[in-house]
Every structure is written in structure tokens, then in C-alpha cells.
Amino acid sequence: MVWNNECQDAWLGWGWKCEIERQNKEYADKIWAQYRQQYHVTLPGVVREYAPGTFYWPSSPFAFEGEMSGTTDGDRHYWSVWHGKAPISDYDSEKSRFFSEYGFQSFPEFESVKRYAPYPEDWDIRSEVMMSHQRGGDHANGLIETYLLNEYKKPRDFRAFLYMNHVLQGDAIKTAIESHRRQMPYNMGTLFWQHNDCWPVASWASRDYYGRWKAQHYYVRKAYDDILISSVVEGDDLKVYAVSDRLENTSGQLQLQVCQFDGTVVHHWGKSVGISGNDSRVCFSAPLAKLLEGADRGTVYVRVDYTDKSGRVYHNNYCLGKQKDMDYPKV
């Protein structure tokens, strides 16, 4: 794969075009003409000649030639969460036809970190050795700390920090993928950045250099399952979406429980539900206040289980607030 990464958006929207036009309009026109020749004439011609029938996309993100990418056509790179410091919850409101890049950083797990930082005196995210293995420098460390303390309570030590950073990353990308899939058919694709690493480093990867799965990798495996049962609060209502990437229709039993953390069931609902192939639709909606039956949002979570006609169970949990605001029992 030859990947033209963000070149058109960079030229049009990152100030490059304006700056070079200000210096030399003729030179700027030449750059754009060469760009058009390479990505809209030469390369698609090569693909047609040597791989007829192969899909060609001139840039990513891209919607129309000579225009910035947007939310109504083509694909979109979304980095307001992470680089832009927007809250993770913003994933639930962002739209696109195809989210082709977004991500959230984490460190490798403790056992992997010990491979390149074996001494306890280096077990600090700003130690010299840890900084040498941070893809985004201290700016990225600051973002991790900011997001972590916004969503979770302060970790007790370095090892706990690494673990909670993994869960934070997994929560963020799970939130994004579920939102994108609920938007079907308006949105028909979601690709997170990134899968793995070429060296041991803090990065956006879901598997570290040594092949160890981060929490994110487990989360996305489930979030990308052929059927997704996803709960979300919209306005005053709790809604449960059934999303299917299967081509055929299916049916099964949907169970919803609002549970306290000691296992007490506050509210229960169950029904036989049909799910259309290649579709997303709301299969349950009710006022959240009614479901809570007087319970505080921080003392409960929503559990949904869908059992299809073959007996396979799809399960998902949903918290009604930030993790630091949940009243978890001490263990």
C-alpha cells in the first residue's frame, strides 16, 4: 500500500499553501500541479494498468479534489480527543462517513517497561530512559496525565499508573468505536491508530513491541465483533443499540440490568429482539431516571446481554459517569 497521508488537507488547511503563495505564487501553483499529476493522474493510471479493479483513494483524509475533508463525504482523521485535549465523551457526538484515523496513547505494560528500564530509579515517566522511549515526548506524558486524572483517581505508584493508563486507553477507543458503529449507515468504517510498534515505546499502539496485548487490544477485539450491543445516554434517556455487520438477519434474547456493584439488580428488562443484517438501530429506550429507581448514577452500572439463536452471547457494560466518580467497593 502506498499511503498519501494527509497531504491534501495539510496543503489546504495547515497554512502551507497560504505561506508559499505569499512568498511565490508561481512556485505554489507548480507544487499543486505536481501533486495533482502524481496522485490524480500517474498513480491511478499505474493501478489501472497493473492491478485493474483495485480501489484507489488519492489521499487520506479525502473527500473531493482541492477541498478539505469534512464530516459529510469521504474519510476523516479525528484528533480533537488526544491532541486537541477534548474530553473522551466527545467521541459520542462526532460524525463522519468513515473515521480512518484517531487514537490515544499509553505506555507498554510494566513487564515490557522493565525490559528497557530494569532499575527502580528509572520507574518514573519523566526519567531519562522513559523519556527516550516516549514517542510524543513530554507533551504526550502531559496529555496522558491530564486525561487520566480527568477520568480516574490518582494512581498510587508507577506500576499502577501504567495499568490505569492501559484501561484509560482502552476505554477511550472503545467509546470511539462503539459511537462510530452506532452511526451506521451514516458512518461505515472506523480504523484506530495504531496496531503495533516497531520499537519499545509509549505510543498509540494496542500491542507493544514485545507482542503483549494492551487493554485496548482486548477492548477493540470485542468492540469490532460482528454484533455489538451498545448502551449510551442520549438526553434524558438510556438507549441500547443493536449493530450488526452480518449480512443476514438474526434474532435472540436481549437482557438489560441496572446493577449495583454488590450485584443487587435495581432494574431488569428482557425481550426477544430481531436484528437486521448490516444495520444499526435502537432496540431499547427508556428514561434513565425510571431505570435508576432512585439509585445514584455513581452506584450502578448498566449490563446488557444479547444471546443469538445459536446460543452465542454478546455482553457489554456501561457506566453512567466517569470512573473516578463511581462508588466502587473496596477490595
Give the positions of each predicted feature.
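Short beta-strand elements
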Residues: S310-V331
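Residues in and immediately flanking transmembrane alpha helices
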Residues: C18-E19, K114, Q257
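Residue-level detector of functionally special positions within alpha-helical transmembrane segments
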Residues: N5-E6, A33, P58, E101
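Extended hydrophobic secondary-structure segments that form protein cores and membrane-embedded regions
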Residues: M1-V2, L191-W193, V304
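Active-site groove signature of glycoside hydrolases
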Residues: M1-W32
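Substrate-binding clefts and catalytic carboxylate motifs of secreted carbohydrate-active enzymes
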Residues: G13, Y27, Q38, T42-A51, ...
